[in-house]
């Protein structure tokens, strides 16, 4: 195996030697033969060999000029770098490679040029329509310029073309240009100027040989036809205002500048607006005003002269030449000045009386305040205004009046149908009196009219009135009573000039036809109820008042309702009841007597001076019944042969010179429609001593018997009556009551 390896290696060495010997020694350059270099750029020339492991390189120019470059060798390659390229590099460079005894040489031609920038277009000025302009197209730092061609076009139109074929042996960078003069027109706006430069180096495709510049045309028109309009006029009054408007034609649109020409001829700038407004003008504002239209290529001006005339100031006084002032009010008189900035004021009366007011001046106004207005202020007031050397005066007449309130209607009393009444219409605190008229109307009918025409120089506030008497009727109800007062001062402005008061009439009718309705009756039994209703006619509807007449004649108020109701009446409720209908016009009354009937009670039967008298004495037997009206009193003397009714006066029976036969039982019966009650007594008549029969046994027995029987009968009647009142009777109860 090792033997085989030795054989193989030996064979490969022999083959390599044979291959190397077969490779020829060669030289190559990059670029191959010619190179076009831009002045200022960096250029590298490369020389390389094949067929030699360690060649030796050298560089030179064909005419043995300086290389003006840097050589770098590395292996089989050598590089010559020129940075930057200049005119010293425009040569034929030779690269020589030596390999042992063999030497090879190859050359590269370096040609230089300069065409670094696009052309530049320059105008001799702005393009103004109708005016010639020169266009210059420049190509800077060009080389070789004998190869240069410049074309100038406007739009698609070739204006000029130029080639620079002059002999140029000098090596330098030069700027070449082409100039054209033309007259622009408006139609050129938007077109373009094209400057195209060509460097004719046909063999080198990699070099930019055409450059161009483009410029859009902007054609201008210098300002012209400048016009000024003035409103309202070039002749003005001091304090007025003026507006001046300026216009100018041009392209681009001219800017407007306003200025004023000073006395020295210089211009004082005022505004950059088309409209110039001057307000509150003074005399110093007179002069020449200049408007200039200015754009990029020119200017155009127009002048106008303003004349400011002195304005006379005016004075106004308000509220007017005359004013009607109400006494007691506050009035302000104002004096105003127009056309004077700093006036001075003074006030006075036409007859130089005291002002009686307060003056306040501020700016162009002065006020005189009269507060409160009084008779001292009835004058003609003058306001004097001084402005500089001028003086003006204005007057105002202050006239007084007083008409502060509506009339007052007063009546002497209420309106009663058929009764006369006096109406008074009073106008308070009025002035002037001789201008006053008062009118009194009922509905649309004039009742009375009066004018106060008396001449009066006295200045005072007075109350004036109109009085009249009339008789109202029912038909007047609802009508309006109108008191109308007029102050006839036609040439004075004030409100109101007429005042009125209105009162609606309501005519009263006194109560009448007053009646009382009693239900069930005016005569009642004790314990019953009764309704008494009172009716009365009148306007307004009468108010009802019930009262009861007391024994002393006075009235006891009971009720204000139309109906008076008494429940469970008692005997004490008997009496005279009075119903009154009352309104503003009067009153009307009606009486009714109410009788409450009760069973007679509290009967008293007495003998005066005693129930036991002596023969010949006078005896009064009296029977009374307590507080029961319309009760019949019957006196009787009881006897076995029959009762004897005695003639009594008001329940009293008088026995004169009593005799023994007058002795006995006397009975009193009190009766009315409701019932009755009995009482009895025994009269004992004693004989005189000389009368033997006076104490007869029969008479004595009768006396004792009657003294027992009569009280017993009375008690029986009493308990029977009591039982009737309760609805039953019991002897047991009677006996208990007696005990």
UniProtKB/Swiss-Prot annotation:
InterPro entries: ICAM_VCAM, ICAM_VCAM_N, Ig-like_dom, Ig-like_dom_sf, Ig-like_fold, Ig_C2-set, Ig_I-set, Ig_sub
S-S pairs: 47-95, 52-99, 137-195, 246-291, 335-383, 534-579
All ranges on the Cytoplasmic side of the membrane: 721-739
Signal peptide: 1-24
Residue ranges of every copy of the Ig-like C2-type domain listed in the record: 25-105, 109-212, 223-309, 312-399, 408-506, 511-595, 600-684
GO cellular component: alpha9-beta1 integrin-vascular cell adhesion molecule-1 complex; apical part of cell; cell surface; early endosome; endoplasmic reticulum; external side of plasma membrane; extracellular exosome; extracellular space
Gene Ontology molecular functions: cell adhesion mediator activity; cell adhesion molecule binding; integrin binding; primary methylamine oxidase activity
Glycosylation sites recorded in the entry for this protein: 273, 365, 417, 463, 531, 561
Keywords attached to this entry: Cell adhesion, Cell membrane, Disulfide bond, Glycoprotein, Immunoglobulin domain, Membrane, Repeat, Secreted, Signal, Transmembrane, Transmembrane helix, Ubl conjugation
CDD domains: Ig_Semaphorin_C, IgC2_VCAM-1, IgI_VCAM-1
Extracellular face of the membrane: 25-698
Tissue occurrence: Expressed on inflamed vascular endothelium, as well as on macrophage-like and dendritic cell types in both normal and inflamed tissue.
Gene3D superfamilies, per the entry: Immunoglobulins
Factors inducing expression: By pro-inflammatory cytokines, including TNFalpha, and also by ROS, oxidized low density lipoprotein, high glucose concentration, toll-like receptor agonists, and shear stress.
GO BP annotations listed: amine metabolic process; B cell differentiation; cardiac neuron differentiation; cell adhesion; cell chemotaxis; cell-cell adhesion mediated by integrin; cell-matrix adhesion; cellular response to amyloid-beta
Top-rank taxon, per record: Eukaryota
Annotated coiled-coil segments of the chain: none
Domains (record comment): Either the first or the fourth Ig-like C2-type domain is required for VLA4-dependent cell adhesion.
PANTHER family in UniProt: INTERCELLULAR ADHESION MOLECULE, VASCULAR CELL ADHESION PROTEIN 1
Function: Cell adhesion glycoprotein predominantly expressed on the surface of endothelial cells that plays an important role in immune surveillance and inflammation. Acts as a major regulator of leukocyte adhesion to the endothelium through interaction with different types of integrins. During inflammatory responses, binds ligands on the surface of activated endothelial cells to initiate the activation of calcium channels and the plasma membrane-associated small GTPase RAC1 leading to leukocyte transendothelial migration.
Protein name per its UniProtKB record: Vascular cell adhesion protein 1
The organism of origin for this protein: Homo sapiens (Human)
């Amino acid at each position: 195996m090792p033997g085989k390896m030795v054989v193989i290696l030996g064979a490969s060495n022999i083959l390599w030697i044979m291959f190397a010997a077969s490779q020829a020694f060669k030289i190559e350059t990059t670029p191959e033969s010619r190179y076009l270099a831009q002045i200022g750029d960096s250029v590298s020339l490369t020389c390389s060999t094949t067929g030699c492991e360690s060649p030796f390189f050298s560089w030179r120019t064909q005419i043995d000029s300086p290389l003006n470059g840097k050589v770098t060798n590395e292996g089989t390659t050598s590089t010559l770098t020129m940075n930057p390229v200049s005119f010293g590099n425009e040569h034929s460079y030779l690269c020589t490679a030596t390999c042992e005894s063999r030497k090879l040489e190859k050359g590269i031609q370096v040609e230089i040029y300069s065409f670094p920038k696009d052309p530049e277009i320059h105008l001799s000025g702005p393009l103004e329509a109708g005016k010639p302009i020169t266009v210059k197209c420049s190509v800077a730092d060009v080389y070789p310029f004998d190869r240069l061609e410049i074309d100038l076009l406007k739009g698609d139109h070739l204006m000029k073309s130029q080639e620079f074929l002059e002999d140029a042996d000098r090596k330098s960078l030069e700027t070449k240009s082409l100039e054209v003069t033309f007259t622009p027109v408006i139609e050129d706006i938007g077109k373009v100027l094209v400057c195209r430069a060509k460097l004719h180096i046909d063999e080198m495709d990699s070099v930019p040989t055409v450059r161009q510049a483009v410029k859009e045309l902007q054609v201008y028109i210098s300002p012209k036809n400048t016009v000024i309009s003035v409103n309202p006029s070039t002749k003005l009054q001091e304090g007025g205002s003026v507006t001046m408007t300026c216009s100018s034609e041009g392209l681009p649109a001219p800017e407007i500048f306003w200025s004023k020409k000073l006395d020295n001829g210089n211009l004082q700038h005022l505004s950059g607006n088309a409209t110039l407004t001057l307000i509150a003008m003074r005399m110093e504002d007179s002069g020449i005003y200049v408007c200039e239209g200015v754009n990029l290529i020119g200017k155009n001006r127009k002048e106008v002269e303003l004349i400011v005339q002195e304005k006379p100031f005016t004075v106004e006084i308000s509220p007017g030449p005359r004013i009607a002032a109400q006494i007691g009010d506050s009035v302000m008189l104002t004096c105003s000045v127009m056309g004077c900035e700093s006036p001075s004021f003074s006030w006075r009366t036409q007859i130089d009386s005291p002002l009686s007011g307060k003056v306040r001046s501020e700016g162009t106004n002065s006020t005189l305040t009269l507060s409160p207005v009084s008779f001292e202020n009835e004058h003609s007031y003058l306001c004097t205004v001084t402005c500089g050397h001028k003086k003006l005066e204005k007057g105002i007449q202050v006239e007084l009046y007083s008409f502060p309130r509506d009339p007052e209607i007063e009546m002497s009393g209420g309106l009663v149908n058929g009764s006369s009444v006096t109406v008074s219409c009073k106008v308070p605190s009025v002035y002037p009196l001789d201008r006053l008229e008062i009118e009194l109307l009922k509905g649309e009918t004039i009742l009375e009219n009066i004018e106060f025409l008396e001449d009066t120089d006295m200045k005072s506030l007075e109350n004036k009135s109109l009085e009249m008497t009339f008789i109202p009727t029912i038909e007047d109800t609802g009508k309006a009573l109108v008191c109308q007062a007029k102050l006839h001062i036609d040439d004075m402005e004030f409100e109101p000039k007429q005042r009125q008061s209105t009162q609606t009439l309501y005519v009263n009718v006194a109560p009448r036809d007053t009646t009382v309705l009693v239900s069930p009756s005016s005569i009642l039994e004790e314990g019953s109820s009764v309704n008494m209703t009172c009716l009365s006619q009148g306007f307004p509807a009468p108010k009802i008042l019930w009262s009861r007449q007391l024994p002393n004649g006075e009235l006891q108020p009971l009720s204000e309702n139309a109906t008076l109701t008494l429940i469970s009446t008692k005997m004490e409720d008997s009496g005279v009841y009075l119903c009154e209908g009352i309104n503003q016009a009067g009153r009307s009354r009606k009486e009714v007597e109410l009788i409450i009937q009760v069973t007679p009670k509290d009967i008293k039967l007495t003998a005066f001076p005693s129930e036991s008298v002596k023969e010949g004495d006078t005896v009064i037997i009296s029977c009374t019944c307590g507080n029961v009206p319309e009760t019949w009193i019957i006196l009787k003397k009881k006897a076995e042969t029959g009762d004897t009714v005695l003639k009594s006066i008001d329940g009293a029976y008088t026995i004169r010179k009593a005799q023994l036969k007058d002795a006995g039982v006397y009975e009193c019966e009190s009766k009315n429609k409701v019932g009755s009650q009995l009482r009895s007594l025994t009269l004992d008549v004693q004989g005189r001593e000389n009368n033997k029969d006076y104490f007869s046994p029969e008479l004595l027995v009768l006396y004792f018997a009657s003294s027992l029987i009569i009280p017993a009968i009375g008690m029986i009647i009493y308990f029977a009556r009591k039982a009737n009142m309760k609805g039953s009777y019991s002897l047991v109860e009677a006996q208990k009551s007696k005990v």
